[in-house]
Amino acid sequence: MTGWPTEPDLRATHHATQALAQRLRLPFRSQTWRGQVGNWIGAGVGSSIDFQDHRPYLPGDDPRHIDWRAYGRTGHYIMKLYREEVTPLVDVALDLSDSMLFDDAKRTRTAELLYFSLESARQSDASLRLFAVRGPHWVPWELASILAYRPPVFADTATGAHEPPVLRNIPWRTGALRVFISDLLFAGSPEPLLQPLTGGKGRGLIFAPYCRAEASPDWAGDIEFVDCENGHRQIQHIESRLLRRYEDAYRRHHELWREHCQKRAVTLARVAAEQPLAATLQAEALPVGAVELWV
């Protein structure tokens, strides 16, 4: 893997996203959570101070939750029910295809989305796991390594590295918010990537960074193109008609992803690289529910 930001750049990115996560975060409040004990309202009953309802006492119930006032009125043991308090689960997978790193602004935005997701989870006391994906290969990315601004280490970066990312082998946790950061610039149906994001009661969310160079290029005349995935070079004469064909194909590709995400109930937010992160998240991610205001 080449082109990962330097340690000073990552340190600055991390510092900025720490501040941003105090105003915007991943959509925790809009979810109903199940999981280990924590600070978030869950789907079941538990022992928080948030009193919810009554039910008759059953053998094995905690007698500390008996409503003695109700017993005095009715002569029956009545249990107080409380909302369960749980810890949200957040699994983040970062696509490290070369197309994510070829452009300076896009590379920075990719790192910003990673550290924003990380800080959203940490500042919300969520249980966090991170993975790096490159073609069919994935590795767990230890939090300590990310906080030390070290890139992930793949045992094999050559075989299949230029293929679309494979998510089905990642050990996603049941009921987790599954965040996939990828530009989605690979051919084929979106379904093989979307199914792992929603299986096992998962909640899928995709941040798709993009840059002006790919979305609205200013090509004209003879242009030398370099495939950032395999290094292949080709000189192509670009005229306005060919440029429009490219722009139409690019637009249709992302419309296809949007349609499939809607069918799968996966939240998709495309995130422009040239604007400040806070501005583009508010403009593009907030309206679709990929982030929420934190006040």
Locations of regions flagged by a protein language model:
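Charged, amphipathic alpha-helical linkers/stalks
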Residues: 49-50
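Exposed, interaction-prone extracellular/peripheral surfaces
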Residues: 1-43, 56-64, 70, 75, ...
